[in-house]
Amino acid sequence: MNMSNKRNQQPSYIADHFSSLDQVITSLREAGLESSNLILGIDFTKSNEWTGRYSFNRKSLHAIGKRQNPYEKAISIIGRTLSPFDEDDLIPCFGFGDVTTRDQYVFSFYPENKSCDGLENAVKRYREIVPHLKLSGPTSFAPVIDAAINIVEQNNMQYHVLVIIADGQVTRNPDVPLGRLSPQEEATMNSIMAASHYPLSIVLVGVGDGPWDTMKQFDDNIPHREFDNFQFVNFTKIMSEHKDAAKKEAAFALAALMEIPFQYKATLSLNRKPVRSSHQHHKPLPPPPEVIERDNAVRSVPNQMTETAEKSDRLAPSTVPVCPICLTNPKDMAFSCGHTTCKECGVVITTCPLCRQPITTRIRLYT
């Protein structure tokens, strides 16, 4: 790796200087930070299916329902906090750890590496793609860090904040000798060190049951960096405290962002010229094929909605109500607005074909 030799010791620890979120926001502004340029990386490794045993009522951490899952909560809190500093409101969002990326690549939430248009779109897109992903592994944060480095280079070395939300630490198999790093640990550490040559802060948000002991060591013990560019935050621990929701959200945002003013100031003294590391940066993959198929199905539905809904009112027998979209299958899925379709059509639409209200609840109907 092409790293500077002038830093033989780990960077000085940046202490917890703030006691409130307002102080963090004020310090961000005083440091001259005007744009947060947020980047999101989401962990889709298979361990998400069981690491919510204690912290998320035995459900998958990616379970989609009426209430937000831990990933949705973390995205929302971070997004709301950093939105005052975001100029274009565009958020590059990446997934990693599924069967298409494993520990080597990332996929973009949208085709052609398109960014999400604001926080609400990022959460909405997350909810759209999750049901169509196949979780896998192992866990490495190197690909998403490398993707963030590429974004910084493509944006004239402007300051960015990469927020990685994950359910576990970097994969380390039991057969790795004591004192040695696993391939995933080595790649992640190399990427963090390479990222320290760029105006890029990395915040790792831990959701689920953990464990997180290795990530705590990563926070303070990575050597040979130009500045202390990595911060780990235990989302589960903070959100499980006995406080009201608003205070817990503020505490989490504070823990995640408290080092950014000092990190931003540290980046001002960087050379700000692209530095190529020895490991290869891969271009983000498109969303997995199942997500593309879902998108294509949704795009085809609106062209049929008006005509098929009108036909269903005229043609559907009263004794066997049929779906107003396909005019074939029986109605066996109801929405919160009270209207019904078949389950095949109901799972791919986001608004009711009759009243156009957003679909927030889907209920299977049985005869």
From Swiss-Prot:
Q: Matching SMART domains, A to Z?
A: VWA (SM00327)
Domain VWFA intervals: 37-257
Q: What induces its synthesis?
A: Induced by the mycotoxin fumonisin B1.
Q: What is its EC number?
A: 2.3.2.27
What biological process terms from GO does the record include?
A: defense response to bacterium; jasmonic acid mediated signaling pathway; response to wounding
Description of the deletion phenotype = No visible phenotype under normal growth conditions. The double mutant plants rglg3 and rglg4 show decreased sensitivity to jasmonate.
The main location class comes to cytoplasm
Q: Which UniProt keywords apply?
A: Cytoplasm, Jasmonic acid signaling pathway, Metal-binding, Nucleus, Transferase, Ubl conjugation pathway, Zinc, Zinc-finger
Q: Where are the zinc fingers (RING-type)?
A: 323-356
Q: Which Gene3D superfamilies match?
A: Zinc/RING finger domain, C3HC4 (zinc finger) (3.30.40.10)
**Any GO MF annotation of the entry:** ubiquitin-protein transferase activity
- What reaction is this protein's catalytic activity? S-ubiquitinyl-[E2 ubiquitin-conjugating enzyme]-L-cysteine + [acceptor protein]-L-lysine = [E2 ubiquitin-conjugating enzyme]-L-cysteine + N(6)-ubiquitinyl-[acceptor protein]-L-lysine
Subunit structure of this chain's protein: Interacts with UBC30, GRXS17 and GLB3. Binds to and coactivates GAF1/IDD2 and ENY/IDD1.
What protein name is recorded for this chain? E3 ubiquitin-protein ligase RGLG3
